[in-house]
Structures are given as C-alpha cells and as structure tokens.
Amino acid sequence: MTSTLPSQPSASDLAVSSRPAAAGRFGRYGGQYVPETLMPALAELEQAAAQAWKDPAFTAELNRLLKSYVGRATPLYEAERLTEHYRRADGGPRIWLKREDLNHTGAHKINNALGQALLALRMGKKRVIAETGAGQHGVATATVCARFGLECVVYMGAEDMRRQALNVFRMRLLGATVHPVTAGTATLKDATSEAIRDWVTNVETTHYILGSVAGPHPYPMLVRDFHAVIGQETRQQCREAFGRLPDVLMACVGGGSNAMGLFHPFVECTDVRLIGVEAAGDGVATGRHAATITEGRVGVLHGAMSLLLQDQDGQVQEAHSISAGLDYPGVGPEHSYLREIGRAEYGAVTDAEALEALQLVSRLEGIIPALETAHAFAWLETLCPTLSAGTEVVLNCSGRGDKDVNTVAERLGDAL
C-alpha cells in the first residue's frame, strides 16, 4: 500500500481537520450539557479558538514554543528488539514508537496545555484551573502557567495523589495549588467534577484547561486539534522512514486525548487501522475495570453525551485501573462515534498484562513507559500474531514511566 503524504505540518494545519456537526455533535455523541452560567464561556472559548487558528501570529508563536520549549518534533523510533520479539518464522510486523514521552514534562499532555494557555492569554484570563489523574496534565498545566505567569489551581483525587506523589510535588514546585478531592472514589472523575464546580463559580476570571477530548463542546474538538500535531508529524515521519502510511496505529485510551491526536489526521485514510486500548483492570468480567468503550452504555457525564460505565439504574459506576490516567468511567465522544461507525477498534488489557508489558519494553528497548502507555504495548500480544509480514505498526508512546515507579515496585513486591 502506498500513499501520497503532506509536507511538514505547521500549527495552522492542526485545525484544518473536520469539525463536529452543529452543537458539537459527533453523530449522537458530544453536545453541551452544562449549567447556563457556563454557556457564554464555552461560546467565548470556541470563538477565541476559531480566531486564533486564523491568526498567523498565534500559530507562529505556538509553532515556536512547540519547537523550542516542548521539544517537537518527537522522534518516530524503530523498536528493533520489540519487533524481533514478535517475529515469526514467516516474518511479522515492524513496530515503531512515536516518542511523546520525550516531550518537556514527559508526556503528550503539554501539547494541549500550551495551546490552551495561549488561548487563556488571548481571552485575558489570569487564573487557570485543571483536573488531573496521573498528574501529567496537572504538571503540564502548572508548567505552562509558570511560563506565562498565570495563577494555577489543580484538582486531583486523593487516591491519585497517593499513587502519583512525585507529580504532586512537581506541580507544587512549579507554583501550582493542588487541591485534594476526597469525594466519591477520589480519582479522576471526582477531580473533574470539582474543577467544573470551580469554573462555574469563577467563570469570569478563570479558564479551565480540560485535559482530554471529553467534556462539553468545544473541548473535544479543541483538545484534539492541539494534539493532532502527533498524527501530523507521524504522517511525515512514516514517509521518511518507509515511504508510505502505516498500516496500524495504536494508543491507550482513557479519556482519549493521545489516541485522538494520533488518529485524527488518519481518520479519512481508511486503509490505516486505528486501535485504542482501554484498561480492563482486574478483568472486564469482574466489574473492576475502566473499559468504557468495551462495556459502556450511552449517557451524560461532565457536560457531554458519550459511552459511560453505568449500573442498571443509569448511575455512573466506579472505574478501576492500576493506571491513574485511565481510571475514568467515560471516554471522549469522538471515540464513541468512531467505534459506532466502525472506523476505530478498541480492546482492553488487565493491570497484570500492562505490568508485564511495561517490564518487557523496559528490558528490550531501554524505555520505561507510563502505565497508561503500557496498556497499548500489552495489546501487541494479541495483535501481532494476526498481522502479516511487513505490516508497519506505529504505537504512541504517550508518556514515560518515572511517575509510576513506586506503584510498579509495590505491585511487584519490591517496594522502595
């Protein structure tokens, strides 16, 4: 399979891709299910983003900072030993890693945080709030707020703060105020709810840098477009590496921002398989999991209609994953739509499988992936035996695993 690829993308290319339909809908998913007090802020944000993408000064500044501050473009790395591990007698796929773990702050989250911080400045907002699960979005938001002199408040579940103590310290070191959230399961869902409550109260002075392709319109579109640089670079780098589009793209999915950033520039390239990997926790059959697309039903959470984990009464269920960044009972509406129309595929792997994959990649490639990313690596065990020789697979290495060392050591019985 061959394909003509675009020239090196610029920031202005990121917003050229398709918009959702009226009222921010992807099919039946998406929308704006929020208090009336937030509607003007959402309209202001949508208008500011539309104007910014048309402003050469904005895109030039974003491009400059993506290069000099974030460290883009991130490499497309051929994982030779991992490829050899999955090789069969008749050959097998070749595995490439899109190294988002090499970004400043250690994950893909900085792409969106930087773009939204620039929008906050354009809108005259001096205070920024964010939610975080694994802490990477919180760190990225605290980082850009320090860079631009913005007040930063981060909401984080108390359980996630325990699991991600290193990132909590990093946020505070960067000048952010980190509020522990003890309600509910004290994880990402509850942190998001608290951030929205803050925004409702302080909407005139505050911009909410939502960290995933979830929430009310325009956030799923906005976050996707700031992360689409991942897929744009991947297209160009694949041409340079092997002269055509990849056959398979893979990424972990919680809310789904890293996956959507990789997938979106390829959505219309129907010969390219798009595979998202969710967290099966203790196993989907146990009920202790975060496999929203695999097991969810349509509902409304945090301002958008999407697939959700729900009980028989329609109440949102608790999610479970060893990975704080995937421990969420919802998913971005565009992922729900891509699954419904058959454009993307989704699987799920357990905590134990993710731990095994993390160790395997660490020992074969000298790269310690985040626990979130390890879920995508774990799916290679299922996928690779089904692929023909010469298949080109690109996996989004969405973050590094420094933040997870204590959790992994504890689970492996080698507590630090």
From Swiss-Prot:
- Which residues are recorded as modified (N6-(pyridoxal phosphate)lysine)? 109
List, alphabetically, the PANTHER family matched. Answer: TRYPTOPHAN SYNTHASE (PTHR48077:SF3), TRYPTOPHAN SYNTHASE-RELATED (PTHR48077)
Which reaction does this chain catalyze? (1S,2R)-1-C-(indol-3-yl)glycerol 3-phosphate + L-serine = D-glyceraldehyde 3-phosphate + L-tryptophan + H2O
Classification via NCBIfam families? trpB
Say yes or no: keyword Kinase present. no
Gene designation: trpB
Keyword Lyase attributed: yes
Q: What is this protein called?
A: Tryptophan synthase beta chain
Quaternary data: Tetramer of two alpha and two beta chains.
Q: Supply the HAMAP family for this chain.
A: Trp_synth_beta
Q: What is its EC number?
A: 4.2.1.20
Spell out the family assignment given in the record's similarity comment.
Answer: Belongs to the TrpB family.
Annotated pathway, please? Amino-acid biosynthesis; L-tryptophan biosynthesis; L-tryptophan from chorismate: step 5/5
Q: What class of enzyme is it?
A: lyase
